[in-house]
C-alpha cells in the first residue's frame, strides 16, 4: 500500500559559488567560534531538581540542646522554719514503753521459733473395721478417715441413715479450746455404700500462725431428728500434734518398754554420783 511521506530537510546555507575562490574563510571561522561559545538551550525537563532531591534528602532542623537548670540547696531557716524538731518524753511514758516491750518479748520469742509441722496423733478409725463398726452403731456417727497435707486437713465421716434431713459438722479449735469453729460437711453420693449409712466429707485449712504450744483438736457432731450425736474419739478428741511432741511421747514409751535402757541410765547416774563424792571427800589412803 503506497504511503505518502513528507520529509523535511534542513540544509545549511553554503557560501556562494562566486565567493568560493575569491573570498576568505575568515567570516565563517568567526561565525563558528561564536556558535561554539554560546550556551545550549535549556531543556524542557529540569533534571537538576530531581537529582538534588535524590542525593540530598530533607533533614530535620538541628537544634542546640537546652541548658539544664542548676540545682539549688535551700535550708529551712532561710524560709523561716526551724532546723530541728524537739520531742520531750516524760518518765511515765518511758516506763510504760519498757513494760510493753518486756510483755511482748515472750510472744516474740515464740514467733521467732521455726515453724513445726503437725501430724495426726491417732490411727485411722477404719483400719480396725470391727471397732469402727461398733462405734458407728453406738454413737450413730464416726470418723472414717483423715489426712493432713501441709496445712490442709481432709477426711470422711460415716453416719447412720436415721432420717432424711441430717447435718454433720466438724468442731475444731486452734488455741486449746479457747475458741472453736464449726465446719459444715458435704454429703457424698456413695453408690457402693450401704443403705443404712451415709458418707460426708470435710476440708479444713489450718492457719499458719498457730503457736506450737497450742493444741489443735477436733470432734464430729451429727444432728438428725432433733437429736445431736457426738464422736470425740472416746473422750480424747482427734488431736494434731507437732513433730517435737510426737518425739517426746515416743521417747517416754520407749523408756517404759525398755527396762534395760532404764537400768543403764541408773548405773551411769550412780557412777557419776560416786565420782563426785570422791572428789569432794578427797583421796583415801
UniProtKB/Swiss-Prot annotation:
Protein name: Protein phosphatase 1 regulatory subunit 3C
Tissue expression profile of the protein: Ubiquitously expressed in the examined tissues including brain, muscle, liver and spleen under normoxic condition. Its expression is higher in insulin sensitive tissues (liver and muscle) than in the brain and spleen. Significantly increased expression in the liver and muscle under short-term (1-12 hours) hypoxia exposure. Significantly increased expression after long-term (natural) hypoxia exposure in liver and spleen. No significant differences in expression in brain for any time periods.
UniProt keyword Glycoprotein present: no
Residue ranges occupied by any CBM21 domain in the UniProt entry: 133-241
BP terms from Gene Ontology: cellular response to hypoxia; glycogen biosynthetic process; glycogen metabolic process; regulation of glycogen biosynthetic process
PROSITE patterns (UniProt xref): CBM21 (PS51159)
Keywords, alphabetical: Carbohydrate metabolism, Glycogen metabolism
Induction remark: Expression is up-regulated by hypoxia-inducible factor (HIF) under hypoxic conditions.
Highest rank taxon of the organism: Eukaryota
Organism (species): Clarias batrachus
Gene expressing this chain: PPP1R3C
InterPro entries linked to this entry: CBM21_dom (IPR005036), CBM21_dom_sf (IPR038175), Pase-1_reg-su_3B/C/D_met (IPR017434), PP1_regulatory_subunit_3 (IPR050782)
Written domain comment of the UniProt record: The N-terminal region is required for binding to PP1, the central region is required for binding to glycogen and the C-terminal region is required for binding to glycogen phosphorylase, glycogen synthase and phosphorylase kinase.
